[in-house]
């Protein structure tokens, strides 16, 4: 159950109900059998002048808040590392703006360092995920052009 947008939805006024009674979305989901969450992480989901891109603004702060709330309710979670600043899917796989001009060798190092940094921060917070998804919907590769689908050697380097 991907809950990455819940904080933004709540901030915009969304309310969640169970049989007509307002409640916490995670508690309602738990009541009906949900036991694991999917939380996405975008590298830097903000414009150059600091405005959020929206769609959940899935940054590290939101990840920690959702993982903490889920942990309190007994959820496990999958961390989805997009390696992008916004949506990555089969039709577009843009590297984070900070990595935009990197070559494949640099991208390999950036992915490794970023992944390690995120996981070490989560470990210090006692919020390590049960599963990690490297990339999002990477059918056609990731971090184009260096990781486009026809460059399988680079894709393997980036995700191993």
Predicted regions and their residues:
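Active-site beta-loop-alpha junctions enriched in small/polar residues
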Residues: 3-6, 42-44, 82-86, 134-139
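Active-site cleft segment of glycoside hydrolase catalytic domains centered on the general acid/base Glu
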Residues: 52-53, 58-64, 88-160
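Boundary/entry segment of secreted carbohydrate-active catalytic domains
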Residues: 1-28
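Conserved, mostly hydrophobic/aromatic
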Residues: 1, 29, 80, 132
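Catalytic domains of carbohydrate-active enzymes, especially glycoside hydrolases
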Residues: 19-44, 78
